[in-house]
């Protein structure tokens, strides 16, 4: 099935979305962390913590962090969960290069590694991981259904899937305030700090188009997962999705 966000691309209508997303993140990689924390007022750190805390009772030893970017989630997860290995995958080498430096600085390079992977065609064998995490990345998938099915394939039986994704508040006045923030503040700050206005115009557009709440949980179930649930965080600005294979 095609979803609205799959048609939204950072730069033009001609090139494949995955190619443009890779180019976009390579472009903004140097400024990404600063801008990401600024735009979320550092609340993104607490969102990651909630996702990681849900995984803690299951003691996953082999974790894949999809769309790992600069490794923020991977580092935080490794420090809390202490897995044997954590593999961060992404299509952007620019983002992962920043992540590799951060992992080395944190002294975690013996446990965290990075691999360039297309989430819709993973190179890992079936039932490879105890847990898979995706923080702020699923709306960039070129094919959401295919990406979810691939994650299901490489998860062990009873393995856990955790997805964090930005979302739109749906109640007054937060919905109206968020609309102004996303249409004016995000693109303006994005242009100032990253020099790539298109990337931060694409961000709110892709959030608006992405399936949320019950619709997203139905999509996750269709990929083969069960025990699917979601929690809205910070007045609905972010949503946490939880599932089991």
From Swiss-Prot:
Pathway the protein acts in: Quinol/quinone metabolism; menaquinone biosynthesis; menaquinol from 1,4-dihydroxy-2-naphthoate: step 2/2
Transmembrane regions: none
HAMAP family: MenG_UbiE_methyltr
Family from the record: Belongs to the class I-like SAM-binding methyltransferase superfamily. MenG/UbiE family.
InterPro entries linked: SAM-dependent_MTases_sf, UbiE/COQ5_MeTrFase, UbiE/COQ5_MeTrFase_CS
NCBIfam families: MenG_MenH_UbiE, PRK00216.1-5
BP term (GO), one: methylation
Name used for this protein in its record: Demethylmenaquinone methyltransferase
Entry keyword set: Menaquinone biosynthesis, Methyltransferase, S-adenosyl-L-methionine, Transferase
Entry keyword S-adenosyl-L-methionine: yes
GO MF annotation list: demethylmenaquinone methyltransferase activity
Enzyme Commission identifier(s): 2.1.1.163
């Amino acid at each position: 099935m095609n979803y609205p966000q799959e048609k939204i691309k950072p730069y033009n209508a001609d090139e494949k979305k995955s190619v443009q997303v890779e180019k976009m993140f390579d472009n903004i990689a140097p400024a990404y962390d600063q801008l990401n924390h600024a735009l979320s007022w550092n609340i993104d750190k607490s969102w990651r913590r909630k996702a990681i805390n849900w995984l803690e009772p299951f003691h996953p030893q082999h974790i894949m962090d999809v769309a790992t970017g600069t490794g923020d989630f991977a580092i935080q997860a490794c420090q809390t969960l202490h897995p044997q290995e954590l593999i961060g995958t992404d299509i952007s080498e620019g983002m992962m290069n920043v992540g590799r430096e951060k992992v080395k600085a944190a002294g975690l390079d013996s446990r965290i590694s990075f691999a360039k992977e297309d989430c819709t065609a993973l190179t890992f064998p079936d039932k490879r991981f105890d847990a898979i995490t995706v923080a702020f990345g699923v709306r960039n998938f070129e094919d959401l259904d295919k990406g979810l099915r691939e994650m299901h394939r490489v998860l062990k039986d009873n393995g856990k899937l955790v997805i964090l994704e930005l979302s739109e508040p749906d109640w007054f006045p937060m919905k109206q305030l968020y609309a102004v923030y996303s249409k004016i503040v995000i693109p303006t700050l994005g242009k100032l700090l990253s020099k790539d206005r298109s990337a931060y115009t694409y961000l709110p557009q892709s959030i608006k188009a992405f399936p949320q709440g019950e619709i997203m949980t139905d999509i996750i179930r269709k990929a083969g997962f069960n025990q699917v649930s979601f929690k809205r965080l910070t007045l609905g600005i972010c949503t946490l999705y939880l599932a089991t294979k």
